[in-house]
Every structure is written in structure tokens, then in C-alpha cells.
Amino acid sequence: MKVCTDACLFGAYTANTIKHSTSNLQKILDIGSGTGLLSLMLAQQIDAEIDAVEIDRAAFIQAKENFEASHWAFRLHIFNTDILNYTTGKKYDCIISNPPFFEDDLRSDDEARNAARHDTTLTLIQLLSAVNDHLSKEGFFFVLLPFHRVDFFEKESLAYHFHLNNKILIRHTATHPYFRAILVFSKSKLTETTTELIIKNENGVYTEEFVDLLRETYLQV
């Protein structure tokens, strides 16, 4: 499961937003953490306790190794379980998820890849239910979605009384259609904003906005 540009973008945006938030976000939950990329990106920039939940055994083992090899191992915790079975006595200030599925996209013959790219292990509605169970009253939920699932997700979120705060629509270039979106929800109603982020210019060079966003994560993009 290789690292994707949109996942790095999501991690950088989330870390930057939390870091500059006026809220005290000290307890973070990463749902469907995979090999731990997002948790590591947040731990690099935010002094918070991060719990990660990953159902796939191989990804869990890799994430555990990645966490233990990092400078922030004492703040990173990984659990090999289904988020629907995850129990804890705490409520989280922030929940992040890059859902391990892309509904309606082409399936592969590899079962592990299917589980990582499709709704075979967790549906969007189940994700919302899990977030509702674990998010604190004043907490925030960051999620990265395929663009074609955004309207559905926004509609379903209303059943859990989530309020959309920020929507970032992402496209490869100015002439490409949107392919991903970052959504930020809370249980409290705040001012909603929608912005656009373009990854590369017409010459195939990363845009200044993209580079600035990832600057604190990477020394060179």
C-alpha cells in the first residue's frame, strides 16, 4: 500500500489546521490508519496523544514498526481491531480518517487491496456512527473522500447532527475535475467555508499553495 499524494496532502492540511486551532486538541483518533502515515504526520507537528485503529493485520504490524521507530513512539498507540468493536473510556478531541475504500471504483483480484480500496470492511455510514461514538462534544472530524461521495456523505452526516465547517475540493490541475475532497465536521455549528486546492500547474510543477502546505512535513517537495 504505497503512500499517495492525496493522503500526504490530507495529513499536511489536518496537521496544519490542528496546530493553528484555538481549541485544545490533545487526544486524536486515526480510524483506518493503514501503515500509520497520517498519525506520524500529525505526531511530527502536534504534541498530542494519538490512538490509531487498523483492522488489517499486515498493515497493523507495519504501522506498529513505523511508530516504534519514530521519535514520537511514546505518544503513538496502534490497535489491531475493527473500529466498530473498538472500546475506550475516552472521548477524542479530533478524529481523522482516510477511509480505506473507494466505492464504485474498479476492484482488483487481490483481497487485501480490495479491503484497502473499497467498502468491504467499513461503510461510510458505519464510519459516521463510529465517529459519533468516539468524538467529544467540542471535537472535530477530518475525512478525505473521493469527490463523487461527498454529497452522499454530507447528507448522511446530518443524521448524526454533524455540521460541516470546511470543504476543500482538490484537483490535479486547473483543467482536471475534482477527484478528492477534505471535509471537516464538528458537533457545533460554525461558519462553513469551501475552498479549492490545485496540486500542479499547467507545466506539471507543484503549485505554490501545495508546496507551502507540505513545507513543514517535507524538507523538499
Predicted regions and their residues:
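S-adenosyl-L-methionine
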Residues: 1-17
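Residue-level signal for inorganic ion chemistry
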Residues: 10, 98, 127, 185
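Conserved Class I SAM-dependent methyltransferase catalytic core
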Residues: 3, 121-178
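SAM/dcSAM-binding transferase cores
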Residues: 175-221
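Short, structurally constrained coil/turn elements
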Residues: 72, 158-161, 193
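Conserved SAM/SAH cofactor-binding pocket of Class I
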Residues: 12-89, 94-97, 103-108
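Mobile active-site "lid"/loop adjacent to the S-adenosyl-L-methionine
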Residues: 99-126, 130
